Each structure stands twice: as structure tokens, then as C-alpha cells.
Amino acid sequence: MIIAAHRGFAARAPENTMAAFRQAAEFGCLWIETDVQLSADGVPVLIHDETVNRTTNGSGKVTDLTLRELRALDAGLWAGEVYRGEKIPLLTDLLALAEEFGLHLNLELKTELTDSDHAIAQLCEATAAVLEMQNFPADRILFSGFDTRTLHHMHKWMPHIRRGQLWEKIPPQPLALLQEIDAFSVHCDWLFLREDTAKSLRKAGYQVFCYTPNYPELVAHYADWGVGMLITDNPAIYRDENRFS
């Protein structure tokens, strides 16, 4: 199984910062998962929450703050003095690191935070524009999201890039929706994955990925179920268990 770094090496550095991404890359992770949102002036930035409150020294909704306002915040100090001065990264920052280390990126598009179809289209279009401008290899990108509308948009904007449908718990009959968005993979909370579901999805041709299994002994059997990727806050525990790849 592939071991991917969830929001970077989030167990060792503040999540979704360049420190966390670089630590994951230097540790040897080939895949990094992160979250993409738009600043108020339309720039793709990497942050998970709807607001900056939890992970910075500021407050307010991400989409209400300009890039200049977002970059003025400290995104590292909450995790310790050593990370003082870490900024909310741009998507372009992570792409540069990915080029340096040959990384693959799982870009979760955070559009479930809005009901606006226009806002969803804006995020998808802006993300596509950055990837095209940077000429980043399509085979090293995976788009993912809980909001199926987003994956429809990315199918339109960049049909050559793979798409993964995120669920907490996979619904009883997922195949029609997966076919509709031409999905490559299904991502779910490891706690709710069932053996029969995993095997039926693999039989139907879909990859099965799980987030965030931080206890290797509890998912050791997932490889037998056909699970291809574990997205964890702490990749080191899988190296310790000789399950790192």
C-alpha cells in the first residue's frame, strides 16, 4: 500500500504548511494530500478549515480574505515557537516542492463549504489554470472532494487528470455516481470501510483509499481487501511497521 502524508507530515509540523510538506518529502513520502481553497482575490491557497481561526493567529473566512491578508498570518506558531513565521502556502509553492522531489499530489478541493455553483467553478478554474501554467505532470495529480459538483467541473476542465470521490462512509450504491464523474478512486474514513464494499469497488475497477488511519495494527488487513493507499498524519509509524512505500 502507498502511504500518503495527510496535510503534509502533520504529526511533526503544522498541517498544510511548507514545513509539513517538506518534512514529508524529506522523509520519503511520494504522495502528499492537501486542501485547496481560494482567497478573496481568486488565488488557490492550501488550508483545510473554512476559517483561519484554528491554524493561524488570525480570524475570518478564508474566502473573505485577500492573498495579502492571508499571507500576513502566522500559520505555524500554534504548533510551537520553532514554526513561527510559517505562512499559508500557495498551490504554486507546493508544486515547486513537488517538482523538486518528484512528488504526487492529492488535491482536495474544498467546495463543500459553499452552496454557490459560481464559487465552485471559480475554484476549479483557478486550480486548473495554475496547474496548466506550471505545466505540472497530469499523472502526478489526483483531484478529490466530497462535493460531486466539484468533480463534475474538474472532469470538464481537466478530463485527463484523475478524480477521487470522498465520503466519510461509502453509500450503499455508489457505482452510478462514480460512473457519472468517471472516478478513478474512492476515498473514505478508515473506520467505516467494510471488506465487502472495498472488494466490490476493486472488482468494479476503482481504487480504494482511506484516511486517516494513524494506527497501523488496525489496518494491517486492508491490503488484503484491496486498499491501495493510506492517508495518514504520521507516515513514520508505517515505516516502523515495515509497511512504508
Regions from the language model: what does each represent?
Residues M1-S245:
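Phosphate-group recognition and catalysis centered on beta-loop-alpha active-site segments
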